[in-house]
Curated annotation (Swiss-Prot):
Species this chain originates from: Shewanella sp. (strain MR-7)
UniProt xrefs under InterPro entries: 3-OHacyl-CoA_DH_NAD-bd (IPR006176), 3HC_DH_C (IPR006108), 6-PGluconate_DH-like_C_sf (IPR008927), ClpP/crotonase-like_dom_sf (IPR029045), Enoyl-CoA_hydra/iso (IPR001753), FA_oxidation_alpha_subunit (IPR050136), FadJ (IPR012802), NAD(P)-bd_dom_sf (IPR036291)
Pathway as given in its UniProt record: Lipid metabolism; fatty acid beta-oxidation
SUPFAM superfamilies: 6-phosphogluconate dehydrogenase C-terminal domain-like, ClpP/crotonase, NAD(P)-binding Rossmann-fold domains
Record-given protein name: Fatty acid oxidation complex subunit alpha
Gene Ontology biological process terms, A to Z: fatty acid beta-oxidation
Stretch list, region 3-hydroxyacyl-CoA dehydrogenase: 308-709
Annotated positions for site Important for catalytic activity: E116, E138
Amino acid sequence: MEKTFNLTRREDGIAILTMDVPGETMNTLKAEFGPEISEILSEIKRDSSIRGLVLISGKKDSFVAGADISMLDACQTAGDAKALSQQGHVVFNELEALNIPVVAAIHGACLGGGLELALACHQRVCSDDGKTMLGVPEVQLGLLPGGGGTQRLPRLVGITTALDMMLTGKQIRPKQALKMGLVNDVVPQTILLQTAVEMALAGKRTAKPVKKSLVNQLLEGTGFGRNIIFDQAAKQVAKKTQGNYPAPAKIIDCVRQGMAKGMQKGLEVEASHFAELVVSKESEALRSIFFATTEMKKETGAEGATPRKVKKAVILGGGLMGGGIASVTTTKAKIPARVKDINEKGLSNALSYAYKLLDKGVKRRHMTPAVRDNLMALMTTTTEYKGVKDADIVVEAVFEDLALKHQMVKDIERECGEHTIFASNTSSLPIGQIAQAASRPENVIGLHYFSPVEKMPLVEVIAHAKTSPETIATTVAFARKQGKTPIVVQDGAGFYVNRILALYMNEAAQLLLEGQSIEHLDKALVKFGFPVGPITLLDEVGIDVGAKIAPILETELGERFKAPAAFDKLLSDDRKGRKNGKGFYQYAAGNKASSKKKVVDESVYGVLGIKPGIDKEMSAVAERCVVQMLNEAVRCLDDGIIASPRDGDIGAIFGIGFPPFLGGPFHYIDTLGADNLVKILERYQAQYGDRFEPCPRLKEMAAEKTRFF
């Protein structure tokens, strides 16, 4: 059996321990490695000729990407998970206790358990390569660093910096890591091993004291000051998580107890808290998202189809969506993009949009001005169909007008090659209708981005009846290169995300008309776990956009999609939301919120002809909106709009911010139980009408006591 860890000795007395997990592209830490590492450490202790040890990865572009998350599923109880953490503590403590200098030579991803391994070394040197990133992202999986990270990190970089890293899961670049004291040196990859060897030969060095601001020195240097830091962090966490995520509070407690009672006590608390989190429903849900997205990256979107290489893209329309799509095409996918718009203003807007985003990277020192300029050079513009003939894909982002989109299809078929894909960024028009104008309908597909394009991770790839498998696979691969998470959905009004969102938004509007206040509605859904409330979302998306989509959905999908009368009243008062500075909330000049705390525009109640009454329980408000979304998600599965519950969960989480700790609509239905959901829906149906009627699939599942997962 091939070993993961190989020890070689140099003539100068430095031993090199290379980690290379057989058959894997990246190194991950597995439980079964414990005995192998302990055996090697015993060998090192016995060999007096070894003067120093360097840890390095045998993989091309990663140090250690973290612990193997799948081993957590083998933990049947909290006791199993605690034993796993304690095993890590034993091995890392043994490494740290070696009486020779131990240096970690880091190139590529050094995350989670990988960084904890590096922290147990006496010194760290990393490459200055763009692929080198250091961090502890466990919180994103509902966990905490369980290999001593909550104890070693604050002792190395300071409490405030360590908490920031652990509570956000952010990844740190090499120069930043050096500045904060996380690594001792940053060098080109070509001399990484040589530098690590020299550091080991120079002998153990105590870490340089981290430069801290005067305030941090005063706070971190006393027990009283540390308590202020922990109390402030706890308050911020409670506000941000709304009590829905247990991991951040436990991370703070680990650091707090470790700093007050010593490393050993801190490690005991870490192992206990880690164990509780591993078996929590929140972490199980977050890990299911991780596994789902990992699995999806291996899929082409169309079985058996091979994607064609996209060497050039054309974007039709230089508006907000067009500019955003062009930007992610050039900056993320590194694919040349030609933007076509009928007027120069649209083109200058698209260029300006991309430049501002890249310039932020320069200001944050994530890239050099030369890199920014090279990426900008990938974007070109035109007001006519010039320089588009060799496009592999054309993404159309013009107005939601069927006749206009038909014209675009005809233009592209005339101007481009026979294999050029025509991808429409429509949010509501069925793709089959757009494809009616095509002589090559197999090349027509939907590619629905969400706004703002550079921030929203999801894209819906919409296949109509005649879309070819090759077109689907090529479009999915293109979206992935843009840094997106694509889900393939079938054609139909609203596709998946807007369809489930529409009923949720309609119900919120209905509650508003019944006298629930705007702030209360938004607070209730934020407390439930959404990033923003439904009324804020309507202001952001645009009340006019909602009003345009609603009748299309009602025509195609029936009476339950009938929008409340609120839209017409608001539009007749010229309220479109943030875009024109007039909506449910007040906006100052320049369309910026007048203060950090949003203020409701009280005059909107008069426009709607309502008077806010007594607010219902927040949980009742949230339930009424959310059950509509859940019911419709199951209908979408039944109608074949989405291929699987997994895709439905990912679409809702990444497309509309469905609370990740619930795992997505389908995971949440399993948690509630289909029988309980049916009872809730039937109760509302009796009270408010047939828009709450449970769909047939849910009734069957309730009767048969079945689950989605």
